[in-house]
């Protein structure tokens, strides 16, 4: 430890991440970083992805296009995360992560957990202390809400991070209840 400052790893060990739940619209949340359940193209889509791009404005899409051109020509891989500006959202950054499509034939839970771990890693790299997550993969990607909530909460609790507060922003009462059951 030089000059009394802590390394990011030491800070991550010192912080216990608080988990809060909100029922509502993630695009109306105030946080250092808002996580987008993106599609691999990073160019917007349906659900949370479309809402974030619409409310955040053209700056988010412009950043996403730059990322596609410079690093992710074939798209962002499932389970990975990358940050852009937050545009007009009440945040400093949007962290885009690509969740897996649910499959009854193949266990993809590790890919879903990776979305949360990688998003927190990116948040740490940015210096974000508050992060708002949607229920990744639980919408149009068909992941059963109870299982999506279990994986999300267990992963956030198990991940070493300097993020002080994670807020799960759930779109309806059943989603909120599924996450509340896991947080208890």
Q: What residues fall within each predicted segment?
A:
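Macrodomain-like recognition of ADP-ribose-binding/processing modules
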Residues: 1-184
